[in-house]
């Protein structure tokens, strides 16, 4: 399953999904029905699984656009069945067991009862059984092992009761890398699909980020020692210097927390962003180096011997690369090369 939620982790939902469909992906994973609807309207016909439990308002779209969904409550069963019956439809569902993350899913002790109830609704088809791993990116696998043990105990119980188990899925990107033997059935590829190794202690060869973000130098100005830059005057020049204005800001997903911390690559060299990042623009200290209006500016990517990816930026503000890529707003054009 290719996870394309949150605008394909910031890479562009439709652009990314169209390419993945042509490369043989089996199905897509989304968080919300609105994302699935966009895929269907773009002509994507592969199975789409909504990995966030549905609200009643989602069911119309689930039926109309043939969206599969995870479920974890009796209300889900009854409301899905009710609306499916009214539309003479069949809804494919994936039963979600909470093995310890405590975000979504039903208690493992309720597994048999839940599956028995599911099978009493003729217009619901059991298409999958799943859970979610909370610590698969950690080298300490004790909690992950506990979750897997609980999950497979539930599956074994169902087998002993004579149930044919549908598609099994619980491994995210880190889980697939950490415990490949448990990747049977289906894996839910997230950030690793976009070229990031989500586990620091295990090397994954030939995985490179597919995203680059570029801008251009919008204008140049010379400022004198003692003059300030941007809102709040958080940067005061300690010498005469050249400032380049770049048309990208926090309205595009460049966090204001990166002010006076991040650097961009221009003409094969890193230059620091100075002053507070604005909504639409930010400023870079060029010093006395040569620079021209319209020169390329690399925010994520490489030029010459310099490179920077979402992991590098995430480290600056003590967060995760997921937050960096998913924050990129829709006003940043997506282009496939």
Please provide the spans of the model-predicted regions.
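Active-site-proximal beta-alpha core segment in soluble small-molecule metabolic enzymes
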Residues: 1-169
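Active-site anion/phosphate-binding pocket segments in diverse small-molecule metabolic enzymes
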Residues: 34-35, 54-56, 61, 72-79, ...
């Amino acid at each position: 399953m290719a996870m394309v939620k949150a605008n394909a982790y910031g890479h562009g939902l439709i652009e990314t999904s169209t390419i993945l469909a042509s490369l043989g992906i089996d199905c897509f994973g989304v968080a919300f029905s609105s994302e699935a609807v966009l895929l269907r309207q773009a002509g994507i016909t592969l199975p789409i699984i909504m990995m966030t439990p549905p609200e009643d308002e989602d069911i119309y779209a689930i039926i109309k656009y043939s969206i599969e969904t995870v479920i974890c409550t009796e209300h889900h069963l009854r409301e899905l069945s009710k609306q499916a019956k009214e539309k003479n439809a069949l809804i494919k569902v994936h039963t979600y067991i909470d093995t310890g993350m405590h975000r979504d899913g039903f208690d493992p002790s309720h597994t048999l009862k839940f599956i028995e109830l599911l099978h009493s609704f003729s217009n619901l088809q059991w298409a999958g059984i799943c859970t979610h791993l909370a610590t698969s990116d950690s080298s300490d696998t004790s909690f992950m092992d506990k979750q897997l043990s609980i999950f497979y105990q539930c599956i074994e119980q169902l087998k002993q009761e004579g149930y044919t188990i549908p598609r099994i899925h619980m491994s995210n990107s880190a889980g697939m890398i950490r415990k490949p033997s448990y990747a049977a059935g289906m894996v839910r590829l997230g950030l690793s699909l976009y070229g990031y190794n989500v586990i620091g202690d295990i090397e994954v060869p030939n995985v490179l980020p597919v995203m680059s973000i570029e801008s251009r130098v919008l204008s140049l100005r010379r400022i004198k020692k003692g003059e300030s830059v941007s809102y709040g005057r958080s940067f005061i020049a300690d010498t005469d210097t050249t400032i380049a204005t770049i048309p990208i800001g926090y309205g595009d997903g460049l966090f204001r927390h990166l002010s006076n911390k991040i650097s961009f690559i221009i003409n094969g060299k890193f230059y620091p962003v100075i002053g507070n990042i604005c909504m639409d623009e930010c400023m870079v200290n060029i010093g006395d180096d040569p620079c021209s209006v319209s020169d390329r500016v690399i925010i994520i990517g490489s030029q010459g011997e310099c490179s920077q990816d979402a992991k590098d930026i995430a480290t600056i503000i003590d967060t995760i690369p997921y937050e960096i890529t998913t924050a990129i707003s829709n006003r940043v054009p997506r282009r496939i090369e």
